[in-house]
Amino acid sequence: LIGLANVAGTLTAGYLGKRYSKKYLLSGIYLGRTVIATAFIALPITPISVIFFSIAMGSLWLATVPLTAGLVAHIYGLRYMGTLYGIVFFSHQLGSFLGVWLGGKMYDIYGDYTAVWWIGIGIGLFSAIVHLPIKERAISVHVA
């Protein structure tokens, strides 16, 4: 379910990214993830809620990829796209590692994942807000 929803969400985000502001779409995706995660931990866990969570979160998970790549290319151009997106991708992997590692440490300390979920929700809300001031215009390059 998550994988199928990922494909649909990524294709939809790419389509919408051609027509609407990428920063607002990214903000909306991060806010959507935050709302979905909050609902998931606030409501009773049932097979139906897990299926809904999987589909909803799956549709938003990789939807950031085409929008982020498009935003980097639009602002900085294609000349350094590989390097810049490599930095973005590396930082994402670093955050993934830290999230899993710290999540395990917090589980060892507290005996459950509640704090990890709430930190993730806070990071999602921060991500939604931090995209809003992005200026979606190309940076002009001045040759010395």
Regions found by a protein language model. Give the residues of each.
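Helix-to-loop junctions at the C-terminal end of transmembrane segments
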Residues: 10-22, 107-108
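C-terminal ends and interior cores of transmembrane alpha-helices
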Residues: 32-45
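Hydrophobic core of transmembrane alpha-helices in multi-pass small-molecule transporters
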Residues: 49-63
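Intracellular juxtamembrane helix-capping segments at the cytosolic ends
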Residues: 63-76
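Multi-pass alpha-helical transporter architecture, strongest
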Residues: 68, 121-144
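Loop-to-transmembrane helix entry/capping segments in MFS-fold secondary transporters
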Residues: 78-87
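A membrane-interface helix-boundary motif in multi-pass transporters
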Residues: 105-123
